[in-house]
Amino acid sequence: MNEQVKTATEQTRELTDEEVRERVIQLAFGGDRERFDMFVSALREALPADVTVVLRGSAVIGVRWEDGAPFDADGPGTSDIDLTLVGGDMLKLWSDDAFYIPKFHTAPLNDETPNHCPSLVPLRRALCRIAGRAVNLQATSSFLQYARDVLMDQPFFTLIEGTKDDADQPEPANGARS
């Protein structure tokens, strides 16, 4: 992790949920709260209630993880939105060859990989239209989501908190965006 990313990560952890939400609206939705609300509504309508939807990456911390460049550094609409679907039966929707960690963490669904999860392609296309930029979807287990936050120090913002059936699920680390 380079210095810009480290600093942005530390600063993000100090923000309130509302401040992170406002950052996301400014960066990813050009300040248009109505488009942000439509985006979240589209997710709520399309996904089961037990699925948590997490936003990661430069839309949350303001810089790219790889090189520390600012969000949309290459021009308006050039940065993507990275969503992770946690829980429910989301992992079962991905094809067997679309996993980074079999049965625990998928590769992203994007323009180049529509066969990873054909059933979510219409949702992804709708989200791209609403956001006016590329949207990547991944699925992960709740344990791996927890590990990414705690072990890898990757901030996230919870767009939708899924209903919980299992009281034994790990809680986010102190200071996690949730």
Give the ranges of each region predicted by the language model.
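Catalytic core of pol beta-like nucleotidyltransferases
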Residues: 2-79, 86-178
